Amino acid sequence: MSLMLEPNPTQIKEERIYAEMGLTDEEFAMVEKILGRLPNYTETGLFSVMWSEHCSYKNSKPVLRKFPTTGERVLQGPGEGAGIVDIGDNQAVVFKMESHNHPSAIEPYQGAATGVGGIIRDVFSMGARPVALLNSLRFGELQSPRVKYLFEEVVAGIAGYGNCIGIPTVGGEVQFDPCYEGNPLVNAMCVGLINHEDIKKGQAHGAGNTVMYVGASTGRDGIHGATFASEELSESSEAKRPAVQVGDPFMEKLLIEACLELIQLDALVGIQDMGAAGLTSSSAEMASKAGMGIEMYLDDVPQRETGMTPYEMMLSESQERMLIVVKKGREQEIVDLFEKYGLAAVTMGKVTEDKMLRLFHKGEMVAEVPADALAEEAPIYHKPSKEAAYFAEFQQMKMETPKVENYKETLFALLQQPTIASKEWVYDQYDYQVRTSTVVTPGSDAAVVRVRGTEKGLAMTTDCNSRYIYLDPEVGGKIAVAEAARNIVCSGGEPLAITDCLNFGNPEKPEIFWQIEKSVDGMSEACRMLQTPVIGGNVSMYNERSGEAVYPTPTVGMVGLVHDLKHVTTQEFKQAGDLVYVIGETKAEFGGSELQKMLHGKIFGQSPSIDLDVELKRQKQVLAAIQAGLVQSAHDVAEGGLAVAISESAIGANGLGATVKLDGEATAALFAESQSRFVITVKRENKEAFEKAVEAIQVGEVTNTNEVTIHNEKNEVLLTANVDEMRKAWKGAIPCLLK
């Protein structure tokens, strides 16, 4: 029972209780000035959570403004629950990615599960039906028992929620590096489909209209979750387990169906998910976006615990709840609709004209705050930025090609590195076929989901090589966007737009803020060049444990349009006799590479370089060749270089191999991680047409020998590897480490 007496306004100021809630002295003075008086305990809570980095982006807004956010297909950019992009035929794709890093570090199963639940709500709150889930995960090295536990529980949490709710988890990525040991990253992405006329906004228009609460009841879980996400993890974080919410996927499944039915009613004015900061953010944001106010009667909030205070109800982050505004007089229709699904829908307030958020409890007004002050007027900080000390040192290093004695052994060792190895152990736990629209299942460059009732598909991927970004944030930022687009193109899709999840350390450290600025500069430049605007996303700061930050990890979630499903292309070889081509030049670039990490146990030097003009030209050529029906298989060359890419294309096929000849110094030819490269196979009869359309070098052919043989330019064999043995090593690596 929380019947402890709340501190009064004078105590809050004199004892600096606001500081424990996350407000600085200057911020508290601003609140005092806005209100013209000292705030009470509930009001202090409202400001502390709405002005947290997690809700207000107060440290990152100046940087986020650099992103291009408009384009001819963009129907909704950043600022709503999720972004929306037109895909023709009166249809649109809705998508967004968010982090649930801090909760997952402490309570990995529920942290990951509720991350999935929250991102699904962001998508269906726009009026869209969720059709696919993806995720991007980062962990420490699997040798550590703690990391094994986090990895197994996070994957189980994602699977548990996604499988129950009946939305396929179709793709994602998992990378392992020591810097994530104490602070894993769990980024979840949801993609939905909508007809243009069904698009809804989270806005509270129309004075006198009714504010209703729908979905699950409110408990004490997740109070101050947004504030918890805006500080560094420490040993005492374990004590904050109550801040991790518990998800109920069956409740959410009912909520989706009820909300999608609700959206068809003209009674609905606005709808928003109660996510971070729960009732506070949904009410303040909906009022502020509409230029209105809201009055709420907290006695009417469905509560699953006794004696909850206004402070607790407003800050709870209990899951599976939405706030809606409906036309006055239509409330009973809404109640009946939700009752049909066994869900609560209660009237708890109304829209007002005076732009104030007013809260009443037990007949008394317990808070009166301008909605704009909470939602829009958080202070914005231009943090000091300073080039990281390591950067100049890395830039000046003379890069030497790593010494490799045995190419075959090295290839096998690379295939067994957890970052490269098969993620089948992960995605086998996910139901990626539910709804039966999945055209390309996990394991290829991008997943493809059918757009029902059409011949179109949506290609989708998450990408980010954090090592490159650590070595050179600006170049690494460009590479993250370019690689995502390359994966979409290899699957037969035209890249449309991105959502981003910016995972960084403590922005109050100038070297971290420099990483944020530079990587956003690089991403923005690539988004402009590749014409993939940023339509929404999420910032996750303070990803540190004991003062050590994670690698800068601005994850890119990209969606592309496959204009005709017959263009869908996958990475595995298709038939013996096809010609193997490599597009793009290989340089001796090993900085941040899988080979460098494997041989030295650390990364250093310069990241691979990228020329965005060249990248765009190659992507356009490859996509045109795929659409012309000239391409059998396509695979982006990424971690592990050409040897790994060719091996993966053979591993995915049945009984096929390849014989190829690679020019240049052998270690670089096999394992360097130069950008803007593709491995493509083409039917022999399409050789001339393909070579006319694409600048590519034929390096060999697909065989039915079940072996990959790679020669150097003198025709000497560098390595011969049996595909079954490679597959066994590649598939067995992660299960073996988990034993």
UniProtKB/Swiss-Prot annotation:
Substrate binds at S99, H100, N101, H102, R121, Q245, E317, S318, Q319, S540. Pathway: Purine metabolism; IMP biosynthesis via de novo pathway; 5-amino-1-(5-phospho-D-ribosyl)imidazole from N(2)-formyl-N(1)-(5-phospho-D-ribosyl)glycinamide: step 1/2. Keywords: ATP-binding, Cytoplasm, Ligase, Magnesium, Metal-binding, Nucleotide-binding, Purine biosynthesis. The keyword Lipid metabolism does not apply. One of its GO terms (biological process) is 'de novo' IMP biosynthetic process. InterPro entries: PRibForGlyAmidine_synth_PurL, PurL_linker, PurM-like_C_dom, PurM-like_C_sf, PurM-like_N, PurM-like_N_sf. ATP binds at Y57, K96, D500, G537. It holds the Pfam family AIRS_C. Mg(2+) 2 binds at D122, D273. It comes from the Bacteria. GO terms for molecular function: ATP binding; magnesium ion binding; phosphoribosylformylglycinamidine synthase activity. It is an enzyme of class 6 (ligase). Mg(2+) 1 binds at E98, N538. This is Phosphoribosylformylglycinamidine synthase subunit PurL. It comes from Bacillus thuringiensis subsp. konkukian (strain 97-27).
